[in-house]
């Protein structure tokens, strides 16, 4: 059976290659150059539209570990990136032109790959095994058909993500666990502010430097009204945040005293409260509720560390606001990247809610591998959650209910180690060793390349 792959970006290119390498014919559909997205400039496959870097090369870094896993899994994209790497001070960066040309040439030369330059405007019929890898700028006709297939509430068309911090970096001598009015469990971490702290925080927001929207994103600026950036709330008035995401009502730290004592309550209650909500099953990652923002990343760190309890916060993702088509993956996808309602349809890349080049490649590898397995009548696979690639796919398919937001590779996604290791470098090295050992049954490379070994 011929497998269809829609989109020849990082994920689609990898998916098509894995299908072909499994000995099955695959049709790779790419609308460029007949129709270009606002962000693309060439008709080559796997075009890198933002940075030319795949992230840190060292395998004791999250991005580097994911790259090494992909090397071991026989990734075409990572192999091509390695061959066209440029000096980048410990990161895997590439010569964009040579890299994309080589990737395109490899796929074009494969005898089992048929390339069709056309726009796919509808999802194929249910009997067709398909990998959907159309990326964050999916064309409107296909996006509309995807909306109809998933339900509008399950397909987002503007990404407004709040920052995420590591739970262990939150100062719980200042912050406290509680839910508003003590309803349910103490599901939130709360960072209280007095009036002076709140006003200083607001002033920092008002003066912080914002990221510039791209031209094609400015047309979508009206979408912000439904999820206003925190700096816009600050601009709307001194108390706007306090009556919005920073409202303190119903939140009390038991260390402050007896909440039923009116005098204690008046003396101790917070002027404003920043809430953090659990992002993963194990409570190791926490997002700042209502803190979608368009501030530059360096400014975010500076301003958000003014929040009491977050003075030393370690950020695994900064807030972003940009156009980004992505699925409500926990409701729609299995860890195999198959759609729950149509197992012959798989998704890969940024459209699934992963962030970063290497994460897109990992999704392409798994979706392509499983498309080939389904076509042969074999059961699909999912990678161990102890690997970075597996942790990402398990996260997007199993994230807690609520507002799902894209996630980059990070060690906070991995299950805890059997024994706690306080030194971060040694801990990340242990995560790496476990991940690569657990990946061994799926991989073909015998050992870690010297270039990706941890710097000692």
Curated annotation (Swiss-Prot):
The entry's keywords: Cytoplasm, FAD, Flavoprotein, Methyltransferase, NAD, NADP, Transferase, tRNA processing
InterPro entries: FAD/NAD-bd_sf, MnmG-rel, MnmG_N, TrmFO
Top EC class for this record: transferase
Gene: trmFO
Any one GO molecular function term: tRNA (uracil(54)-C5)-methyltransferase activity, 5,10-methylenetetrahydrofolate-dependent
Residues given in the record as FAD binding sites: 7-12
A biological process from GO: tRNA wobble uridine modification
Major localization listed first in the record, in broad terms: cytoplasm
Record field: catalytic activity: uridine(54) in tRNA + (6R)-5,10-methylene-5,6,7,8-tetrahydrofolate + NADH + H(+) = 5-methyluridine(54) in tRNA + (6S)-5,6,7,8-tetrahydrofolate + NAD(+); uridine(54) in tRNA + (6R)-5,10-methylene-5,6,7,8-tetrahydrofolate + NADPH + H(+) = 5-methyluridine(54) in tRNA + (6S)-5,6,7,8-tetrahydrofolate + NADP(+)
A Gene Ontology term for the protein's cellular component: cytosol
Signal peptide: none
Taxon lineage: Bacteria, Bacillati, Cyanobacteriota, Cyanophyceae, Synechococcales
NADP recorded as keyword: yes
HAMAP family: TrmFO
Name by which UniProt lists this protein: Methylenetetrahydrofolate--tRNA-(uracil-5-)-methyltransferase TrmFO
Cited Pfam families: GIDA
Swiss-Prot/TrEMBL cofactor(s): FAD
Similarity remark: Belongs to the MnmG family. TrmFO subfamily.
Location in the cell: Cytoplasm
Originating organism: Synechococcus sp. (strain RCC307)
Function, in words: Catalyzes the folate-dependent formation of 5-methyl-uridine at position 54 (M-5-U54) in all tRNAs.
EC identifiers of the protein: 2.1.1.74
């Amino acid at each position: 059976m011929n497998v269809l792959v829609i989109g020849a970006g990082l994920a689609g290119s990898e998916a098509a290659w894995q299908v072909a390498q499994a000995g099955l014919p695959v049709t790779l559909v790419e609308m460029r150059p007949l129709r270009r997205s606002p962000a693309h400039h060439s008709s080559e496959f796997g075009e890198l539209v933002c940075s030319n870097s795949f992230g840190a090369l060292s395998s004791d870094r999250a991005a580097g570990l994911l790259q090494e896993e992909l090397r071991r899994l026989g990734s075409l994209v990572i192999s091509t990136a390695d061959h066209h790497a440029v000096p980048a001070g410990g990161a895997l960066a590439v010569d964009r032109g040579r890299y994309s040309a080589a990737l395109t040439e490899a796929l074009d030369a494969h005898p089992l790959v048929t390339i069709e330059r056309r726009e796919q405007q509808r999802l194929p019929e249910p009997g067709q095994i398909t990998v959907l890898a159309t990326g964050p700028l999916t064309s409107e006709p296909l996006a509309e058909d995807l909306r109809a297939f998933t339900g509008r509430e399950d397909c987002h068309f503007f990404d407004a993500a709040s920052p995420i911090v590591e739970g262990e970096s939150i100062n719980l001598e200042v912050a406290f666990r509680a839910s508003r009015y003590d309803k349910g469990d103490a599901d939130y971490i709360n960072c209280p502010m007095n009036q002076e702290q709140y006003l200083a925080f607001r002033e920092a927001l008002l003066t912080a430097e914002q990221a510039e929207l791209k031209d094609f994103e400015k047309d979508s600026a009206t979408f912000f009204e439904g999820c206003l950036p925190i700096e816009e709330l600050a601009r709307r008035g001194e108390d706007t945040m306090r009556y919005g995401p920073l409202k303190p009502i119903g939140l009390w730290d038991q260390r402050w005293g007896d909440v039923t004592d009116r005098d204690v309550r008046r003396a101790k209650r917070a002027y404003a409260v920043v809430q953090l909500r659990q992002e993963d099953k194990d409570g190791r990652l926490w997002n700042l509720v209502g803190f979608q923002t368009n501030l530059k990343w360096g400014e975010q760190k500076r301003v958000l560390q003014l929040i009491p309890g977050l003075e030393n916060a370690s950020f695994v993702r900064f807030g972003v606001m940009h156009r980004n088509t992505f699925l409500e993956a926990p409701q729609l996808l299995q860890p195999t990247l198959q759609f729950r309602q149509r197992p012959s349809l798989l998704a890969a890349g940024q459209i699934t809610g992963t962030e970063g080049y290497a994460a897109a490649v990992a999704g392409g590898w798994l979706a392509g591998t499983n498309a080939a397995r389904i076509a042969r009548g074999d059961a699909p696979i999912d990678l161990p959650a102890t690997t970075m690639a597996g942790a990402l796919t398990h996260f997007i398919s199993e994230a807690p209910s609520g507002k799902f937001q894209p996630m980059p590779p990070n060690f906070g996604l991995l299950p805890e180690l059997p024994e706690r290791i306080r030194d971060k470098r040694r801990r990340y090295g242990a995560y790496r060793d476990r991940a690569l050992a657990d990946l061994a049954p799926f991989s073909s490379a015998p050992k870690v390349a010297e270039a990706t070994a941890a710097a000692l």
